């Protein structure tokens, strides 16, 4: 199976937006757009990534959050209309990022789930849920299990950190113990990063608050691969028996540092093993193959080194 991984699309669409829609945290997002984010992240780069994935024979698409810039209805509709043209609901798994839960209003009405999954997740027969909780849920495709988690929640201005909460970690452990899941190659999906790549004072305002609890649950439950976004940076780590991977933002078409260029990954799973990770990089106006690695190339980190 070939699994395509994109993240941090930051799709911008202000159709129908009103002035009063910006009397909240969107005000800071608006300043970021004026300051250059709107030029840095482009829709065409996302479309080029999806085109390249389709041409490469990707079987299943994974999106690890930040589909939108400001969690506006117009943004969700436009980005999902685009994704629908490449991968239908049976061939994709999507989790939210902090930009998809940008305001309390967008979280309260669960705009993300309305546009991405519909209003009744339990009506989707292929989703394995834990009781009445919407997150996490599992989807099994062949011998691969995708477990989707929600690390996004409305936070104060200038805070972009994530949290899963005890109930999601407990439900994750319950899902991992199920017989039909335990026998699969298990991939956990969330938006926020676990390993603090940049050790700056403000990093605590960006990373996953309960990353140690989450990683312990993954280790104990036999998660093979964790895919995330949020950093807009390429990184590949191995902690214990669990691989952790981020390609970067797939929508970045203008960049100053090479590591911040638009990227996406294609993971090849054979016989319940990850055999190849192909990373594509945006340059000269389109995506090109950049590098291939195997699990042995991931940087090993002792569990105690996760700050």
Residue ranges and their predicted role:
Residues 10-14, 69-72, 98-106, 154-159, ...:
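Active-site environment of divalent metal-dependent phosphoester hydrolases
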Residues 159-163, 179-224, 231:
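Active-site-proximal segments of metal-dependent phosphoesterases and phosphodiesterases across multiple
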Residues 269-307:
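A short C-terminal boundary segment appended to hydrolase-like catalytic domains
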Residues 84, 203-272:
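Conserved beta-sheet core of the metallophosphoesterase superfamily
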Residues 1-4, 136-148, 177, 183-185, ...:
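Beta-strand-turn-beta hairpins that frame and shape the catalytic cleft
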Residues 1-76:
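N-terminal active-site segment of His-dependent metallophosphoesterases
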